[in-house]
Amino acid sequence: MRIGRNLVKMDVDMLRTVEASRYVVPLREGGSLPAVVEADDDALYVMKFVGAGQGPKALIAELIAGEIGRALGLNVPELVFMELSPLLSRTERDEEILDLLRASVGLNLGMRFLPGAFAYNSLLQPPPAADLASAIVW
């Protein structure tokens, strides 16, 4: 990725593409209904769906933000393109999830699932190191 005058140019060939093989569990946080999904490389990913309410622009923003964070030296989980087959929805019973899966067939965005990770909470102790906090805020 190269960052220059109000322009972010990314070489998307640097991202691997994996095939979603199993829908594990929805993450009912946020508006996009991401899910933990197993891929054909036997790894778990948090999949962000192109068919979610925010649409494909939200995934593009997440991809760009993740790669900018990586370029700045922040620890960012691996980002991958995830192919979603229409066959993955055949056993889903939840109508909302089923609609999302059907609307998201094709290319989506995934990030490596981090077991034991949790959302940032400023009340948790100890706070992040000052140099890490300043790098994130920058």
Model regions and ranges:
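Conserved kinase catalytic-core segment
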Residues: 115-138
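Conserved ATP-binding subdomain of kinase catalytic cores across diverse folds
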Residues: 7-123
